[in-house]
Amino acid sequence: MAQQHLKFAIFGNEYQAKKSASIMQILSYLEKREAEVYIESLFYDFLTKVEHLEVQAAGVFEDYNFDVDYVISMGGDGTFLKAASRVGAKGTPILGVN
């Protein structure tokens, strides 16, 4: 039987460039554990086009079109609330990293 990999959605704040190192640590950790990582499109654009980071992701999502096991919110209260509003009634656990 094939092992199922956990799926994560990541939301972030594109105004907090100083957190780029922490973001890359989290992405590296998840990649080593063969997790599927999906990144919110605005945050992905920030990481790749503004910060010029090489980000490995299974996909990029907008709005509510993601189906994951966990959500990681990288930022403050506003980012967490944005993630919570997108999760809605799905009941997906959210980990907030400030």
Spans of features found by a protein language model:
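Small-residue-rich beta-alpha loop regions that form the catalytic core of phosphotransfer
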Residues: 16-19, 45-46, 50-52, 58-98
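Short internal beta-strands
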Residues: 35-42
